[in-house]
């Protein structure tokens, strides 16, 4: 999996990345030459100063390389999750970052979707596209409520009701491990409501959706109170019911966060 982010020099500069587009292409070609037949690339859109046309060029260039899996994420900025030494973090702290308006970001998302779909890549999750048989098995654990282990500096893990994160200092991580200790920085136990909210938000990211009635029942939440909103989503073309499953349409996936918040 390659964190390309963009082939455009101006976008990479804004993100504080040290590579350029040609370097990313050469890295992809090197992976192919080494025998890798499953290469994934990640991209970011919604960057300050970025245009819809630049996003289109990125998507077309990525599709032309023939990658089996492509991810495209809208940029979100969280000062707490950005390392202090990252240029973007310093700019954010100084109030120098202005992201594109929401309607432009949605237009970027739709351009990516259309370009990838024309190239034979299926949108199987809000931000992820793949050729048949190449869906991300790792990320599916996040979207379907599975467990995963935190291995490495700053990694996060989830086992049952517990969520935990490792220390973000490599030096401290090594000290803890060599002392036979778990290098955890924090741990919390999620309530049934928190797990329900997470399950709904993550499950609706998938193009296949989720069984909302069963999810409500599993976590003690009333489905009937949500039924009118579900019916409204279907009537407005933002979702469809397939048996017991509720899945969002392309238009619904574009506003996934707002829909999930209402259902929670």
Give residue spans per PLM region.
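Short amphipathic alpha-helical interaction segments
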Residues: 220-235
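Short, amphipathic alpha-helical interaction segments positioned at domain boundaries
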Residues: 251-264
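C-terminal scaffold of the Radical SAM
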Residues: 1-221
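A short, conserved structural fragment
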Residues: 234-244
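Minor-groove-contacting beta-hairpin "wing" of winged helix-turn-helix DNA-binding domains
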Residues: 245-249
């Amino acid at each position: 999996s390659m964190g390309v982010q963009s082939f455009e020099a101006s976008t990479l500069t804004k993100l504080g990345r040290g590579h350029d587009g040609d370097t990313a292409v050469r890295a992809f070609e090197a992976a192919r030459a080494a025998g890798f037949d499953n290469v994934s690339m990640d991209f970011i859109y919604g960057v300050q100063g970025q245009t819809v046309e630049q996003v289109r060029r990125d998507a077309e260039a990525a599709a032309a390389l023939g990658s089996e899996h492509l991810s495209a994420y809208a940029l979100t900025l969280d000062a707490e999750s950005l390392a202090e030494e990252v240029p973007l973090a310093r700019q954010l702290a100084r109030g120098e970052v202005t992201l594109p308006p929401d309607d432009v970001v949605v237009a970027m998302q739709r351009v990516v979707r259309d370009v990838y779909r024309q190239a034979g890549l299926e949108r199987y999750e809000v931000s992820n596209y793949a050729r048949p048989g190449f869906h991300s098995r790792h990320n599916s654990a996040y979207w379907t409520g599975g467990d995963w282990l935190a291995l490495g500096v700053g990694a996060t893990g989830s086992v049952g009701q517990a969520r935990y994160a490792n220390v973000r200092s490599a030096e401290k991580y090594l000290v803890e491990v060599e002392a036979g200790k778990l290098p955890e920085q924090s741990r919390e136990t999620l309530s049934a409501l928190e797990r329900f909210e997470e399950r709904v938000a993550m499950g609706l990211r998938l193009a296949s959706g989720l069984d909302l009635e069963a999810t409500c029942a599993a976590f003690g939440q009333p489905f009937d109170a949500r039924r009118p909103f579900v019916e409204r989503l279907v009537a407005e073309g933002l979702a469809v019911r397939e048996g017991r499953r509720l899945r969002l349409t392309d238009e619904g996936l574009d506003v996934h966060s707002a829909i999930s918040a209402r259902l929670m």
